[in-house]
């Protein structure tokens, strides 16, 4: 009885070497790693925080308006239109009274008076249509106080002897366009937070760094000063210091000193953060190696310690900006900060102190909407940066 001899599978020996090389390359490719730096890891995590990205976009639009507000605002913020005071926001239309479709336009207005309150009333005249155009000539200005021009981003093209108000957010009691004033007010209300935080950053970095790195008696003195400052009520302290500013000072000087007042208490939280980080890092081996290498104390702090938690410092600064914005708004609203004719969101809200005025002209509260929006966007951005900088958050 014969048995079949088992046959072994045929092997293409001439392809074995090539296949092995390909598998080896695949393994090498799979085992290769990309080395990402700290900031790149932070950016990857930040990109997954959609709310923070939206906040960054909105704040970017705000600061773009701040830079180019002379061009973007439809009117000069100091110009008064006496015939259109306390005018409600105008309505933008695309379909006229006959049902025809147009590009965005507004109707003309007829000014009358309420027979009971004697307040001016503006009624749309549907027989007159005024298209809204882009790059429209209007009030003259100097962009950044350097480049003269009269072209505005949008507006109603002027007619000889005829003015048609494009008050998208209404006008105030003096006939100023609220939208233009909000754009210009953002220049102060949004920059006071950045400048105040910059001053607070310098103070917090220096005093917190000295306290955390050297410790001992210096640390005790600085910490007790911080404890005293934190125990002080913020708003009353700001009010008392701002009220001490002379009434005849130029507004630019008042703006500078209000910024300093806002930063007086803003540096304490950052200083405590830097101190705690330095206390935990100053005894590390790489710090000792830097000392043995002859590095000075300042070089050790700047080159080896601060970069290790720079992301936390940025997050802390970002979350502190809303407090500065609210502080300026509160001081100006109460009349002890910036004053008219300076334009800021807080100064604009002085018209809304009277409850009866607010009831009759609620559009005077539009600056509140922008203050709340700016504060929320900074908080959302700070939350996203904090989550991105935290290594324990995935």
What are these regions (language model features)?
Residues 2-201, 205, 301, 337, ...:
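Gly/Trp-centered helix-boundary motif
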Residues 171-394:
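Alpha-helical transmembrane segments of integral membrane proteins
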